[in-house]
Structure formats: C-alpha cells, structure tokens
Amino acid sequence: MNQEEVGRYNQMRARYRATVVQRGLREDTAWGQPYDALNVQAWASPPLKDHVGLLQEELKQLLPADTRYVPVDRLHISVACLLEGRSGGRPENASRWEKIGAECLESLRDVCARARPARIRFERVLSTDVAVLLVGRDGGELDVLRRCIGDLMTGCGLEYRPKEIIHCTVARGGPTPGNGAELLHWADERYIDVEEFVGGVDVLWEWTYPSLATTTEARLELAGPLPRPDRPS
C-alpha cells in the first residue's frame, strides 16, 4: 500500500477498534434486517475464492453462530456504491434512479468502455463491528473509474457516496462482548498476498440480508486484454 492507502486503512482500523474493544457490540442498526443497495462490483477469481474460503473456516471458530458468510461462488469486489443501502426497504433515491436509470446505465457503459483493466492486490484483513473485509489496492485505474462514475451520477442528479476502500466482504457479522479483542488480533495477524485481475464489472442490486444473493442489472465490460473470471451461474 502507498502512504495514502495505509493512512486510510489505519484510520478505519482505529475507528472500528474503538467500537469493538470498548463496547464489543454491533453498531449497525441494519443488522439482521432486509438491506438492499445498488453497487458496482467485480467478480472474484478462483485464487481469491480459495483464500477467502480458508479465512471463513477460521472465522467460524471466532464469530457468533448467526454470522452470514458470503457464498464463495458469489464472492465479489466492491468498487463503487451507486445507491446507499437502507434497512427494511428500498434505498434512498431509488425512485429517482428508476426514472433515469436506463440513460445513466448507458452512460456508465461508455465510461467503462474507456476504463483500463485493473490489478488489485489484497494484503490486509479488516475487522469492523459488522463485517470482516479484505482490503485491496490498485494502481489507480479503479480510482479513475470511481471518479468518472461520481461525476456521471452527480450530473444525473443522483447522490454519490464513494466507498472508502476497495474491498471484498468475507463475512457479515460482528464481535460479541468477550471476543472483540481476539477477533482484532486475528485480523492483524492475517497477511495475505493475492493479486486480482479485473477486466469487467457489474452493476448489481444487492439484497444483503438474509441471503446475500445478488441480481445482475447490467454488465459493464472494461476495455483491455486482461482476462475476466467466469461469472457465477
């Protein structure tokens, strides 16, 4: 990670460490409720799936029984958030998106057609109060894509909240009183080194709870020669 990325990661880690260690409770009010969002995501490749599968087996010894693990065949990398999720119903601005969604999606295809493929290196595991994430970095290609997406959405009159980090969700579940420090220590000790090649992204409605299932709304191909993993059936 470069200096800026390390600083961003450490800020997030410190923020969640305070919550986990001092309170040991889930802060997200959406926990256990239906929760949907519209995101830009890339599907994970077999090597990344293998690493996540091993991490999930370890986490089963640390996290509560109600933890929800992302099915390995649906493992994805979160690149940008188009509509922030909202518990118990549709995301805010969903109706606005529906009115101009077709036009906006077509523009997104144009943006992605000009984007370069990206190499993402996953090195860190981040434990938050509600999820366990793999944190990735790229050479700047996805940052350029995210800025273009933001400019496009703003121009369409839609709010855009860029994700703080490029990440892959391993599990949705948080610590309980008594195991928060252990979980943080586990995450700190996990150093991985997986390089991921992203040659295409999807725009997905993501129904996060309870099934973690996703439904494809539109597929956006990045330009360039890098191979893209086969998409789950």
What are these regions (language model features)?
Residues 1-233:
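Histidine-dependent nucleotide/RNA phosphoesterase domain, centered on the 2H-phosphoesterase fold
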